[in-house]
Amino acid sequence: MPFGPASRLGVSLFDETPPVEWVPGRSQEEAETIIRAIYRQVLGNAYVMESERLAVPESQFKRGELSVREFVRAVAKSELYRSRFFTSCARYRAIELNFRHLLGRPPLDLEEMRSHSTILDTQGFEAEIDSYIDGDEYQSTFGENIVPYIRGYKTEALQSMVQFTHTFQLVRGASSSSLKGDLSGKAPKLNALVIQSTPTAVISPASAGATFSTPPTGARTRLGVDASAGGKVYRIEVTGYRAKTFNNISKFRRSNQVFLVPYEKLSQEYQRIHQQGGVIASITPV
């Protein structure tokens, strides 16, 4: 089942749209619908110009020479995909996006990230793409003729809370794209979180704190003692620091900041943040 109201989390479209499956022999119009769905998923919801479309694989698919799985492979190995999500992105960002585009989920753990990094080192880009599409998970989930789709936004048996929350880091709503709809852009988004197996707050894309993006570790600030009398410390994620400007230049070096605050100082810190124009994205116990 979806976690919380699907519309608030930006996944209602995923939840309401059944998997798209191709049945060979259907009309050209239906084939075109499948092709558009594949471009949308594999290219991360990005706009594809007519001149960028893959004319030869499209024609082969319409003639029944390629299955959905093989057309997905053709798109993922294309120069269009390579230029957008591989050569222009940091390595671990490219791997994160491969998981999103080809398996519809975030990477499980550090070991999974390392194994794909090793494939890139030893066998190259095309072998990395094949490792997803030829894997047992792809075959058992999508088979030969189901278009890959976003998964992981529903709570399921054996799914870790880390993987569940990381899904919402990779997918910021059904209308967002892999790069332009994400503040991380081409930099790794999950790398440090996966290494430390750290779950993240699930923030609605429509909320005031939706613009929060985790800053570098060095940007974290610990206020006061290490813990309260009860031993509790809370992590406050803040975004939107735009107040207190001089000549249109903010006094804050970063618009996104993280504070570690003892319980006794939560109220005081809450007031300070709002006085300075910040928006609290989340408050979670550490």
From Swiss-Prot:
<dbReference type="InterPro" id="IPR001297">
    <property type="entry name" value="PBS_linker_dom"/>
</dbReference>
<comment type="function">
    <text>Rod linker protein, associated with phycoerythrocyanin. Linker polypeptides determine the state of aggregation and the location of the disk-shaped phycobiliprotein units within the phycobilisome and modulate their spectroscopic properties in order to mediate a directed and optimal energy transfer.</text>
</comment>
<feature type="domain" description="PBS-linker">
    <location>
        <begin position="2"/>
        <end position="179"/>
    </location>
</feature>
<feature type="domain" description="CpcD-like">
    <location>
        <begin position="231"/>
        <end position="286"/>
    </location>
</feature>
<keyword id="KW-0472">Membrane</keyword>
<keyword id="KW-0793">Thylakoid</keyword>
<dbReference type="Pfam" id="PF01383">
    <property type="entry name" value="CpcD"/>
</dbReference>
<comment type="similarity">
    <text>Belongs to the phycobilisome linker protein family.</text>
</comment>
<keyword id="KW-0605">Phycobilisome</keyword>
<keyword id="KW-0042">Antenna complex</keyword>
<dbReference type="GO" id="GO:0015979">
    <property type="term" value="P:photosynthesis"/>
</dbReference>
<comment type="subunit">
    <text>The phycobilisome is a hemidiscoidal structure that is composed of two distinct substructures: a core complex and six rods radiating from the core.</text>
</comment>
<dbReference type="InterPro" id="IPR008213">
    <property type="entry name" value="CpcD-like_dom"/>
</dbReference>
<dbReference type="InterPro" id="IPR038255">
    <property type="entry name" value="PBS_linker_sf"/>
</dbReference>
<protein>
    <recommendedName>
        <fullName>Phycobilisome 31.8 kDa linker polypeptide, phycoerythrin-associated, rod</fullName>
    </recommendedName>
</protein>
<dbReference type="InterPro" id="IPR016470">
    <property type="entry name" value="Phycobilisome"/>
</dbReference>
<dbReference type="Pfam" id="PF00427">
    <property type="entry name" value="PBS_linker_poly"/>
</dbReference>
<keyword id="KW-0602">Photosynthesis</keyword>
<dbReference type="GO" id="GO:0030089">
    <property type="term" value="C:phycobilisome"/>
</dbReference>
<dbReference type="GO" id="GO:0031676">
    <property type="term" value="C:plasma membrane-derived thylakoid membrane"/>
</dbReference>
